[in-house]
């Protein structure tokens, strides 16, 4: 950090990123040099054949060339190990070394070509020597090809626009010019991100919704990354440091922060009842994912169980529309929910941007009409997730501030129109008019379910919603408070999605910058220690030491790079640890739905939960407990529906077996 400037443009790699690539190349080159030297010493007496003098010269020059490359790579590696992320001064000679290293590729290419030509001419020498030359040529071209691929990966399309301003500084541009430059860079960045997203989603149909989602997602990414000059390894190092810092804070505060109390019997009974409901309705939320999740959960027997359903002809007992392998999907739904064919009213696997698959079924056990909305499982769903602007939710309620996540709001509106306009709910309640309406979903489906329940509440006042691992950035604070009477959310452990919002991502970015600015260890040590800590654990107190107090001014400065300099010129920018997060009108603070049940793992079950059965406690939690993203190896796995289902199985069975335990689930630990 910042990205290096070479050949007049910025690259998405920093001068301290070359330790590990350099070490890998150094090992390959040294082994290669030893092999060539051994080959030459053992067979130099057998090179008196036709063309042998050329091969002898080839091997000698190759060894000299390899020795020069080894020395250059060693120097690059040593220089890259100097300094810290925020102190690139000791690495100022890196650009010259890289120019030398790149220049050495030309004689390597020439020599590899000559070796290939000589071998192709049919040199009549010892076969071992010829095979050694062939191996040398192959290795040379593999390294050259790998270098070309690496250059493509670290190429920054905006590098040519940003590099000229790295030496100009703010003193060379007035506020008007700097504002124009910033707007120009942001426009270019949005265009680049939109091109990337279109390439990634090249197989998605291009309708109006998709084009809007492309633009919305591109603007989100360009806005988020516009005020820093972070390279990917900086983010990885920051996340590693932040994880250790969070664990250290939790360990130090735990004795003072644990508050044990005996809640009222009504509160505990309510928690037990809602946990049982969550345990029951999670089956429907999982069923909405269809056969992929079912096979994933049952890798050995799943395919055999639903194989017959895949080949079975459809019946007329239910509507089954959209998507492929519909009978496979429906077979997995039957096995997951335990319902019969006649219990399903409508099953849709139609999947487009802002249009989510869903199912409607009659649940006779709970006497409810269940609407289950599928979560993220396709690129179309990802684009729906990333359409993070806010729009006013069109609902009939007394709440004034009705802002909601645009993508999820439109997805919920689509399901609402299908349920009402196509008469799906009317059909369901004509069969079971005494049943109540329950809407469920996981992840994106959980957010859509919460919005859908709010839209339907005017027509169905008794509606209930169970949102499993819903995104935090769903709707306004007023709607969050309004929804607590009919929506329950369930969150497992450090799951990142219920903590994910644009505001929280901005907070995470600032915390990463802050912890990186404090650290006085080189990046390669941070990454090595972080990898060890993630895999095997350790003592989080062994954090890299911090900068002296006199260097605290680093925290009030944007980290290096032209875009950071541009934001520094803006009077609206503040990097102070005490400054509030900026709230853009397009991305205001948004909150999770309803009341929240938090499942937390008790004891240790291995770093990834695979060493022994985990046990969980459950408690009601305030939404503020999910106002920061927590880093850890389970922040992604805790979001998986199969992991959540196992956690629910565990906590429900444990609470049922411990009805006489008054302290069940009453501990609360707040982690800053």
Swiss-Prot record:
Its main location: membrane. It comes from the Eukaryota. Optimum pH is 7.0. It holds the Pfam family Lipase_3. SUPFAM superfamilies: alpha/beta-Hydrolases (SSF53474). Residues 39-58, 124-132 are extracellular. This is Diacylglycerol lipase-beta. It comes from Homo sapiens (Human). The gene is DAGLB.
